[in-house]
Amino acid sequence: MAADYPNIDIAPFIDHALLTPTATPEQVDQWCEQADRYNFASVCLYPTYVKQAAEFLHGKKPKVCTVIGFPTGATTRSVKLYEALEAVENGATELDVVINLGCLKSGNTEAVHREIAEICEETGQVVKVILETNLLTDAEKKIAADIAMDAGATFLKTNTGWNGGATVADVRLLKEITRERVGIKASGGIRTLNQALDLILAGATRLGTSRGIDLIHQRDNPEKVE
């Protein structure tokens, strides 16, 4: 039961995600209004909607977060950098960047580092590096985490949500690796309050989810949470 957990306000942990391919401008306004109303950390949307979200949230607390190289991470370094710079120009202050998994798995760690470092240095914004942990071994997770931290990442993010969701085990592992030097964003498949609280207690400092409103309703109606 949610009532058995510590009294944690989950709202400031939530990156309110709208990453469905069918997202509309009307939904973007709805997500921004919800993020402001419930004091979420950010809205996380595709680059095409960054300018709209930045205008809606101007002067308000929630940040505008977007995704770079999403969801595969397989675009070229120059394309990712351009995408990131354009997003910042349009008003994004947080960038969730998918790591180049092919380079990582083939041992080309220099390419992985260079790509992340360029985005961190040239944008000067919060960068959350998406590791896609469900596709990595524990050894690869450590290598990827170390590269991202050395390159200047602000957060490590577990997943895109396209290849499975966040797990408590992965969050614990990342906390052990990072020793709290950077934040940890758990993302993918977060649908219940208990699941969200388990991830926070394991070490997550952000939660990426499209179910933020559901989590708030579960928080406010604990008697209905199973």
UniProtKB/Swiss-Prot annotation:
Catalytic activity: 2-deoxy-D-ribose 5-phosphate = D-glyceraldehyde 3-phosphate + acetaldehyde
CDD domains: DeoC
Active site per UniProt: D96, K157, K185
GO cellular component: cytoplasm
Keyword list, A-Z: Cytoplasm, Lyase, Schiff base
Annotated compartments: Cytoplasm
Enzyme Commission no: 4.1.2.4
Keyword Cytoplasm in annotation: yes
Single GO MF descriptor: deoxyribose-phosphate aldolase activity
Pathway assigned in UniProt: Carbohydrate degradation; 2-deoxy-D-ribose 1-phosphate degradation; D-glyceraldehyde 3-phosphate and acetaldehyde from 2-deoxy-alpha-D-ribose 1-phosphate: step 2/2
GO biological process: 2-deoxyribose 1-phosphate catabolic process; carbohydrate catabolic process; deoxyribonucleotide catabolic process
Function: Catalyzes a reversible aldol reaction between acetaldehyde and D-glyceraldehyde 3-phosphate to generate 2-deoxy-D-ribose 5-phosphate.
Family label: Belongs to the DeoC/FbaB aldolase family. DeoC type 1 subfamily.
Name of the protein this chain belongs to: Deoxyribose-phosphate aldolase
Natural source organism: Trichormus variabilis (strain ATCC 29413 / PCC 7937) (Anabaena variabilis)
Gene: deoC
